Regions:
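ATP-dependent carboxylate-amine ligase
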Residues: 1-15, 36-39, 313-323, 327-337, ...
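Phosphate-binding loop of NTP-binding sites
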Residues: 89-241, 247-255, 309, 371-372
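Acidic, Mg2+-coordinating active-site environments of NTP-dependent enzymes
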Residues: 72-75, 196-350, 373, 427-428, ...
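Active-site regions of enzymes building and remodeling cell-envelope glycoconjugates
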Residues: 75-83, 148-151, 256-261
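Short internal beta-strands
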Residues: 63-69, 238-243, 379-380, 403-410
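N-terminal leader/targeting and accessory segments in enzymes
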Residues: 1-91, 95, 268, 294-296, ...
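Short secondary-structure boundary segments
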Residues: 67-70, 179, 201, 243, ...
Length: 494
């Protein structure tokens, strides 16, 4: 809890009407979450204006409101007016929660692909060293060994600060956080001082939001600018950067923090080579600081070699020896929905993966090709109300690698799923190889069933797009749908 008059001191040029000598027990920008003693922040969003809910918040128990527009309020309420409530929120919310990020080592992982697996690898290594670790990411929030659901890769400012505060209260020493480009562009991570920033890669995604690739890159770079910004309260900063990525050098230019670069082409300070893979595992040599280490993992795919290097780099910055890192990695298991093998005793492989970008899809298809014994069968679709330009690109990639391609639905949202499939189909036709073929089955359940029913011994059935997700977003509702459950059900029918 904080005194409102102290909260007001964190704001720029506030106009205060009413009594500010009140105690604030909670702070929120969601009128539905208001309780007695709350400060309600009215945000003017893209679709909803919080100023329309000020009086609803007061009825629910708010004792003060933070606004940027003139509002008629009911009751004896303190009204704080600022130029921009979103900017004000970034200042006052971390203060309200006592700047929790300053009490933990904060490791931020950003990039188009690989954030989730890299974050979980870092957690696994840190935990093996006896640290209590928190994770905030696409799959869930973890505080120690307890998992909580999450709705955005990076929560909004209020939720994030509340989560970080809870982590501190429960004794977390290290927080590993996936930091999305949306969060960086919208200031959701304001008030969070990162100790380590990790860059995995950058390929086309989220252009529906960022509009241009340069804007997308600029958003990602904010994390690296932050770790070397002046007036920092913490020491021991560093950046881990994939130098094989074509944008790695651009990211390096944005930070003056100590850097570990990683590569599989021998270009980094941390390098992997002599990579051997099976459908379930990988083995390779990691070279660092003049020494070689053999790393054996229960994960496969070249993309996971990159993820492992990123995690190793982050943990080296935390002072963990390469020997201890190597020991911990031997017991790491794949993250749910990341090249996850579905096994029901069938004579072919079924893999479920979250790949939903052109690069992500190509990565898992390259892995499938490296370990294939027979055909590659691909089941995938593209999301509605998202970057439509990647649809034909992903269609072309699927056709270039797949022997059989099933184009289907994947969270069509408000768009017509048939039209989305047609957009994908343009690229499929361009990329189709001699001897390969494709089929359109808009119903995702039917597409999965058909792919598995027609699989032959030695085939790899790759179901891409959803991974760990257990829902399908339709025009007027969200239904339960889990690719892993659907695959298992289909396997039991053959």
């Amino acid at each position: 809890m904080k005194q409102l008059q102290d909260i007001v001191k964190t704001l720029q040029a506030p106009q205060v009407t009413g009594n500010a000598a009140v105690e604030i027990l909670d702070i929120t920008a969601d009128s539905r979450a208001v309780k007695a003693g709350s400060l309600f922040i009215a945000l003017d969003g893209a679709t909803v204006d919080g100023h329309n809910y000020v009086n609803k918040a007061i009825e629910a128990g708010a004792v003060a409101v933070l606004v940027s527009k003139i509002v008629e309020v009911s009751g004896d309420i303190c009204v704080i007016t600022v130029e921009d409530t979103r900017t004000a929120m970034m200042a006052c919310v971390p203060y309200f929660f006592d700047y929790p990020a300053n009490s933990m080592r904060m490791i931020g992982v950003t990039g188009t692909n690989g954030k989730t697996t890299t974050s979980h690898m870092i957690r696994h290594i840190l935990k093996a060293q006896g640290h209590k670790v928190g994770v905030i990411g696409t799959v869930h929030i973890m505080i120690g060994d307890t998992s909580y659901p999450i709705h955005n890769t990076t929560p909004d400012v209020v939720d994030l600060q509340h989560i970080l505060h809870q982590m501190v209260e429960e004794g977390v020493t290290h927080c590993v956080m996936e930091v999305s480009s949306h969060a960086l562009a919208l200031g959701r991570v304001s008030g969070v001082e990162y100790d380590t920033a990790v860059f995995t890669n950058l390929t086309q995604d989220h252009l529906d939001f960022h509009k241009t690739f340069e804007n997308y890159l600029a958003a990602k770079c904010k994390l690296f600018e932050q770790v070397s910004a002046p007036n920092q309260t913490k020491s021991g900063k560093g950046a881990i950067i994939n130098i094989d990525d074509e944008y790695g050098h651009r990211v390096i230019e944005k930070t003056t923090a100590p850097i570990i670069t990683y590569s599989i082409d021998g270009k980094g300070t941390l390098n992997a080579h002599d990579v051997e893979m099976t459908p379930k595992s990988s083995r390779y040599t990691v070279s660092y600081d003049g020494h070689d280490y053999t790393v054996a993992m229960n994960t496969t795919g070249l993309f996971n070699v990159y993820n492992t290097l990123a995690a190793i780099g982050a943990c080296l910055l935390e002072g963990i020896s390469m020997e201890d890192i190597d020991k911990a990695l031997k017991t790491f298991s794949a993250v749910p929905g990341r090249f996850e093998l579905i096994e029901e005793g069938q004579p072919f492989a079924v893999v479920v993966d979250y790949a939903h970008t052109p690069d992500g899809l190509e990565n898992i298809l390259q892995t499938a090709k490296a370990i294939q014994e027979n055909r590659i069968i691909v089941v995938f679709g593209c999301g509605g109300d998202r970057d439509a330009t990647k649809r034909p690109i992903m269609g072309r990639i699927a056709a270039q690698y797949g022997d059989v391609v099933y184009v289907t639905s994947d969270n069509p949202r408000t768009e017509d799923p048939v039209q989305i499939v047609k957009d994908v189909e343009v690229g499929v036709k361009e990329g189709l190889r001699e001897g390969s073929h494709y089929e359109v089955i808009v119903d995702r359940r039917e597409a999965i069933q058909h792919a598995i029913k027609n699989a032959k011994p030695g085939d790899i059935v790759l179901i891409a797009g959803k991974g760990h997700e257990d829902y399908q977003i339709l025009k007027d509702k969200t239904i339960h749908f889990d690719d892993r459950e659907e695959a298992r059900a289909a396997l039991k029918e053959i």
